[in-house]
Regions:
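N-terminal presequence-like segments and the immediate start of the first folded domain
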Residues: 4-6, 10-97, 103-161
Length: 161
């Protein structure tokens, strides 16, 4: 009975380690001393969309792309992208530490953007936040959002290398 339980536990540990190793192998990783820096979604020649360091996930600024000319729709689409990035990094909005929001027209769009934000944010784990008006990279963009979050746990703690 104990051998079976131990074998099953060992098998699960090996499967988890293999999965993590496969994920880690496809990430661009650099090491400085004992501090690992993991970069995900590095296809863009200018930036990574996700950087993980010391248990903190940094996302690049996200925009809605072609979500129309309504700030609510753009905010919803942008936050969906943020959710996807956080999930890929191994965390979620409930671990968000800070958010920066840029609006093309803060006087016109602040209230509507906040309605969507309030529906999205975890009410028990609200991050610090700043919202400012900014010239956007493309005329169609009304909102851009960048989120920094804590990891659920250290992704390297179970790996032996």
């Amino acid at each position: 009975m104990y051998a079976t339980r131990d074998q099953e536990r060992c098998k699960k540990m090996l499967v988890r380690a293999a999965r993590r190793a496969a994920v880690t192998a496809r990430r661009a990783t650099s090491t400085v001393g004992d501090n690992r820096v993991v970069r995900l979604q590095t296809e863009d020649p200018r930036m990574s969309k996700i950087v993980i360091h010391n248990g903190v996930v940094y996302t690049s600024g996200q925009t809605a792309g072609d979500a129309g000319d309504c700030v609510k729709a753009q905010t919803q689409a942008t936050l969906a992208k943020v959710d996807a990035l956080l999930k890929e990094a191994g965390t979620s909005k409930s671990h968000a530490l800070s958010a920066t929001i840029w609006l093309k027209d803060i006087n016109r769009d602040f209230t509507a953007m906040n309605e969507v934000w309030n529906d999205w944010v975890d009410p028990d784990n609200k991050p610090v936040r700043a919202t400012v008006e900014a010239a956007m990279a493309r005329p169609v963009l009304l909102v851009e959002i960048q989120v920094t979050a804590a990891l659920d746990k250290n992704p390297f703690e179970d790996l032996n290398y």
